[in-house]
Amino acid sequence: MKALQFGAGNIGRGFIGKTLSESGFSVIFSDVNQNIVDAINYNREYFVKIIGSNQNKTVNIKRVSAINSNDSNIKKIISSVDLITTAVGPTALEKIALIITQGIIFKIKNQFTKPLNIIACENKIKSSSFLKQVVLKNLPIKYHDYLNKYIGFIDCSIDTIIPSINNKDDLFLTVEEFKEWIVNINQFKGAVPKIVDMKFSNNLDAFIERKLFTLNTGHAIAAYLGLIKNYKTIQDAISDKKIRVIVRSAMEESGSVLIKRYNFNKNDHLDYIEKIFLRFENPFLSDKLERIGRNPLQKLRREDRLIKPFLGAFEYNLPYSNLAKGIAAAFYYHNKNDLESIELSSSIKKQGLESTIIKICDLPVNSKEVYSIILEYNLIKKIIR
């Protein structure tokens, strides 16, 4: 069995590539970073340190190779593999779709009918379904029947934390023991691959939003609040009592949306929040706030980790003040090395805060949602001082 993994970063190597290799796949990584590509091809293996609650261990990931995403030979690889996975970030999916489209066309022209399943592992709800729509837009209509018959696009939810830690070995990664990979079993074409610890669900939306509204929401709010106070790591931010209360309360607010929407058991969900907090506090998984907070425009989109639960609270007439504080903190974020942060700051300066919120978050003009964010923005420094 062969798999092509787009993205050789932390999640790509530390979670997806590792899991696929342990499941018996030969894994080909595709990335635009030629240094990483060369390192993988030179070593043909890499090491991952797993941080557990009781003990740590290091595992050797073998059967790996790599190709640059711009290499024209990648279409041949796409036509021959059994599985494609991605971990490139939601904004890069459209570029990946163009590459996948060329591979599918090559597969069709060579009359290959072996089913191909594609799992986009991104922090975007139904990212594989989104990827499919982009591929269909680029694929000639005469090939659409082939795609619908032989190409599966499987939506999923992934949950794990892999911090960026400087190592002498560029390929070495430190990961947490906890991991979750849940997929929609109904979207596979052909035989369902046997992948270690992969779980199947017929109600994937609930799991996707549970992770997005809890891990991702809490992570982002802790980062943006912590950066206002010049903290460096997630542990530093969570150790601040005022920030801790806001983050925990925001996760409970987003949790109330989930409980209402999906009929989750309240006590079970509060236990899930507690587990997330313990993961944030793990000193062996120290993660930099600048990494967590990067790409604020993406994180402030209507369907992402901050605005979606916030709007859910309005939808069900539930508390939202701490979610609003987290969103306000995101508009404070400024990092001269982050292009999205620069664009965000420039928009606030030129267009004003209200217009920027309306545009980026896709919120109604003169709405309670917008004014609640502005209110918290004007108070945020006093609140966490």
Swiss-Prot record:
Name of the protein: Mannitol-1-phosphate 5-dehydrogenase
Pfam assignment, any one: Mannitol_dh
GO CC, alphabetical: cytosol
GO biological process assignments: mannitol catabolic process
Reactions mediated catalytically: D-mannitol 1-phosphate + NAD(+) = beta-D-fructose 6-phosphate + NADH + H(+)
HAMAP family: Mannitol_dehydrog
Organism, scientific name: Buchnera aphidicola subsp. Acyrthosiphon pisum (strain Tuc7)
GO molecular function, one term: mannitol-1-phosphate 5-dehydrogenase activity
Gene3D superfamilies associated with the record: N-(1-d-carboxylethyl)-l-norvaline Dehydrogenase, domain 2, NAD(P)-binding Rossmann-like Domain
Lineage: Bacteria, Pseudomonadati, Pseudomonadota, Gammaproteobacteria, Enterobacterales
Similarity annotation: Belongs to the mannitol dehydrogenase family.
